[in-house]
Amino acid sequence: EDKTLGLFHGKLGACIYFYVSSNYDEDSLAYQTAKELLVQIVQKVSSVKSIDFDNGVMGLSLGLSFLMKNNYVEDTSISWLSRMDNYVYKVAVKTLDMDIKDNDFLYQVDILVYEVIRYNELKDNYKKELCLRLIKALFNQIYLNRPVNFFSEAIPFTIHDRLISFLFVLLEIRRLGICVPRIDRIFKEMKMFLFSLVPILNPNRYSLYLVSSLVAQVTDDIEWMQYVERLKKSVDMEGLFTKDMYDMSILPINGISGMVLLMFLYNRYSNNSISIDLERVEDRLESSLFWKRFQNDVSFMKKYYSLNGYCGIR
């Protein structure tokens, strides 16, 4: 029995999968399985000390919030969300006074992503104001204290990349009307560092192209537009979902499923949309040796059963 509770690699990811699969049928095996998993999670959630998305408090909070918003569970978990918010807030405030090492920089970007998501969900004006102040402090600190290799590609490919995540979350903060002049100034300053980057890996060119295109659209900056065109020409869309990833690379965080998620996110906010042959993508997913290994390798199954694995792909 897996003792991990987390969103991407633990029980909460599986819990969400079974609730969604149940189609709200309370008599179904999927619903009952989800309900049992939720009981196990709630019993142990207070013991979680890490705050990351994978297996920590931020992932648990967002997962429980999703279940409540979609009426899979009652709002009785609201007290847990409040406690989790308070815990993350305290940790986040501490990081503002810390000298963040290069390897931990994504950790701070993740906190910013979490706070922006929660800002959209919070109803309490006092908590919303605290969250807003933290968002302003965090994004400025991240930008001003970024490491020298911040404008570089992630190898191997992952959608959970600090540069891509930071650009996406800046766009969302701007969309909310928060510090728009400051963010536009950051986008302008970024040009001298970012525009020399054309990633080696095709999936990295694709993800940078998507987020840069959104920046170009909101800023209406001709230089951003030119950079986007250069990236677009360098992306092999034909081979992106079929040839660029090795057979097992179908996971949501660092595989084909993740690239599809990025496309949906882009289409949601963009003035134009990208379309791919989803049937070909589905064939590619189904033909992967991932499924055979998942059935035959117990250690592999335990590692990849949750949202960044079986449940997320399904």
Where are these regions (language model features)?
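Glycan-recognition and catalytic cores of secretory/periplasmic carbohydrate-active enzymes
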Residues: 1-314
